[in-house]
């Protein structure tokens, strides 16, 4: 058996450099060049001290001008900007959840969308107090979808899923006025507070930032995750591959990109059909390969084993291969640059959502009622485009790694049951994992999430942090582009156990798992919150006592700020490798790195030096162990 070997970041970079050579031949632009054109960045923006929320400005804070025209100081301006950043992210993730609710409402027997996990639907219905006895599963699905949609605008009460928290934690959030109410209310309240002439008190702005994030994580995102499982199946371990080498030169290559599984699931369904495969062969291809970029890739990887072509900063690379017949996108994290870039090649750049329309794209509006018809048309368009390839521009880097993905909370519990003595011990709990942590076999866990960011060497922070954590017997649960970085490197191959400390290696062998567990897309960080809550309840602890931390070393988007706020709001210390534009306010820095502890039991740590960042995470995990006496 050959020795296991990681793919290095240097190898990623060599592959990209070769693709950029192809791009140069056709005059293509790429993010590497645009970054240079935008450097150096605006220092006022980086510090968060630029205000443009009214037409008396824009105002920027300097030692000579410490207040804006209205009198707001740096602390208020930075706080308002942070809150607006959060609101943008919470609205985006929660709108994803809303779309999934609408799709569930359209589900029907024999229709485009069907209920794949009726047991989970019934379980959530009972959790919400919805009667299930004697109901047709689709009648129940429609009732649950409508009930879920009411969570966005209900006039009273808090998010239903907050009841999943350990006893006392929900009450603490209510007491500190950060328990999320209606999802749309928290977004609207945030924008109201950040309006000219409203809040400029940093403490109030940070509290609402956490509350708004919590509406995302324990509201919109959690519904997006749970109802996607109902519609498309709850993920379980499945083997796949990752990196650009998953594209096949002899096949029609369709790349799905974005975040909404309603689109990608249907594309995969039709690309797998005999009719479309036969049609592809009729135009000279050997078959059809669907691969993915970003979170929609994570969605279809963990349910179907569809290979992952790459993460956020590789979206241009799939076009630069010259072998991509169509890149089909839905919403979020889509470069407008894909339009002009695709025109340099034969690639069809197809947008499908009225929420994400860009120039130089072909727009095919996708909706639940016509999903099958839309998907079939898109797959056929890609096949018809195969003949337009320019062979001299085709180059697919032969980099790929094996990955085992699909570790939902349910799948993790099932894995734990497999190493439990069912004659003696209780099954269906997280207690075996707690025993590993208590005994010190595993020191703790890191939830590694987030994006790529050109400010940091792409993928390097994710991969290096993970390598050091697993070497120190700290298990990683990963989602989003962080998960794809791990998969591309090989850290989701079960053979990566050889990179672990002795304790974690033994656990990986016994449970037959990789040391980095793929939990899904960015909305699926809600799975991590559910897992943390289950660990706390099974141990009798509060979440903030667990030797668990969160980390987003290369975060980039507004969604990441919302995520960070709900992870902190849940009680999990969160470590960032990129400053969240608050350095211009000492009060905001203090509140986010220490002040939030009195409300949630957790706070942020920001450290741009990756070596120092991982040491701080390990140190925090060990501090928590010491406090527990383990």
Regions found by a protein language model. Name each.
Residues 2-630:
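Anaerobic metallocofactor- and corrinoid-dependent redox/one-carbon enzyme cores
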